[in-house]
Amino acid sequence: MSRKSLVFVTGNQNKLKEVVAILGDAFPWKVESKDIDLPEFQGEPDEISEEKCKIAAIKIAGPVIVEDTCLCFNAFGGLPGPYIKWFLKKLGPEGLHRMLTGWEDKTAYALCTFAYSSGKPDDPVLLFRGKTMGQIVEPRGPRNFGWDPCFQPDGFHQTYAEMASEVKNGISHRGKALQALKDHFLSLSEPDIKKAKCDEHER
């Protein structure tokens, strides 16, 4: 029996590869990507994720997941947070590191939220979260995956960018959120999401 398709809304093929690798062969859905334009919402991470997922479900007309990622500097009260995409685009990893020049507190946390919709208007949007603590450092490693070069997770001497993919996926914010999503789907004989509870994996 062929697996049902689950659309991951992204135009980033690196993200798709990482998501597929983390979910693994046991995941009961076939994950495919589609690059669609979604509005840029403002607000708290959960609100942003839920609204993006609702719009995506309407456009896809079927099961869909969307991801929202935050990089939060403790010295800045959690900013850039959900707006990290725009900071990264303007400043790059080096600029993100320079933002904390003069601040003693270099600690930060990476937060990932995956939102799932069955595509049915009456079904709730489910949120799966993962959080990894770390610090902002001078960029090291390849520059092909966002702000990975300047985030060093607690307990490690390497940045995300310097890590082997299997190591990063095991401890990253995205890995934790996807593990929660995977556990949820594997706990269901059929993905009838209405009665299920979401998990939150935090480090």
Swiss-Prot record:
EC number of the protein: 3.6.1.66
GO BP annotation list: deoxyribonucleoside triphosphate catabolic process; nucleoside triphosphate catabolic process; nucleotide metabolic process
Cell location: Cytoplasm
Residues that, per the record, bind Mg(2+): 40
Reaction(s) catalysed (UniProt annotation): ITP + H2O = IMP + diphosphate + H(+); dITP + H2O = dIMP + diphosphate + H(+); XTP + H2O = XMP + diphosphate + H(+)
Record note on cofactor: Binds 1 divalent metal cation per subunit; can use either Mg(2+) or Mn(2+).
UniProt keyword terms in alphabetical order: Cytoplasm, Hydrolase, Magnesium, Manganese, Metal-binding, Nucleotide metabolism, Nucleotide-binding
Any GO MF annotation of the entry: nucleoside triphosphate diphosphatase activity
Chain sites annotated for binding ITP: 10-15, 52, 68-69, 85, 145-148, 168, 173-174
One GO location term (cellular component): cytoplasm
Keyword match Flavoprotein: no
Alphabetized InterPro entries for the sequence: ITPase, ITPase-like_fam, RdgB/HAM1
Top-level EC class: hydrolase
Top-rank taxon, per record: Eukaryota
Cofactor or coenzyme needed: Mg(2+); Mn(2+)
Annotated family: Belongs to the HAM1 NTPase family.
Assembly information from the UniProt record: Homodimer.
Record-linked HAMAP family: HAM1_NTPase
Reported function: Pyrophosphatase that hydrolyzes non-canonical purine nucleotides such as inosine triphosphate (ITP), deoxyinosine triphosphate (dITP) or xanthosine 5'-triphosphate (XTP) to their respective monophosphate derivatives. The enzyme does not distinguish between the deoxy- and ribose forms. Probably excludes non-canonical purines from RNA and DNA precursor pools, thus preventing their incorporation into RNA and DNA and avoiding chromosomal lesions.
Protein's recorded name: Inosine triphosphate pyrophosphatase
Species: Nematostella vectensis
Taxon lineage: Eukaryota, Metazoa, Cnidaria, Anthozoa, Hexacorallia
